[in-house]
């Protein structure tokens, strides 16, 4: 009787363990920027595959990085780092190498956005969306053709009128470009020069903001300044007078990537979800809802001719040539941060 009872217990434990493993294997855990993965996309994946998508959100690369750095066994399968953080995470062995043979939709990606310095062979990253930083003007107040360069923001008639992004790297990149330097410059003298240049922009600066810059432009609390192409693309529905300009000196291209964590607990599901996100019809849906250009050429082909001709959705090769990919500047980051603090307090 004892043996019989013992066998029942063992059988139950085996069944319970198998059930638990099955339940855990039928999910993929995603850690993504706030409002950056449409709910209907996750729902469609679950409907097609039976794999549930658990979504957690973060508001900055720093938050995501710190959480993964604190515990490599935190349970996330997929993260969405921006290009410059992807490089840092790759170098610190925080990511799983990607087997492209498991991604049948990889060939749809735009070659112009592949093989960049932050991940030379895309062994650790898949482009998700591309963000470009440029100049925003309201054509009711300012002729768009009169503001074609970053340097134009220093005009005297823009005194106390600019919206400047509350983003250290973006703002220093703007100044470095006006001086003819790389946005990833690590020369302390050049960084100081950029800081001094930005100090002269303070009289023209009305507000530093990155959180609700769309609302500020739509409500016309600022009619000229910096902005991201995707945000302005969506804002034009509420205020069609908003125009986005790709500055002549160049601009920042930030690629938000899909990456697999080093200890992804549901590796095969991660591959399935990433491949699903690269499917042209899904990539199109994401781009239209989020507002940023898709790196997926198959998705662009599915869009209307009007959207294909829209440089906010589909910047051409000539435009992209002027862009620079944001990379990690870890070795001089404290210097950038010190000058940024001084700039924000107006000294």
Predicted regions and their residues:
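Paired acidic/hydrophobic, glycine-rich loop segments that form the ligand-binding mouth/hinge
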Residues: 76-80, 206-207, 223-228, 243-244
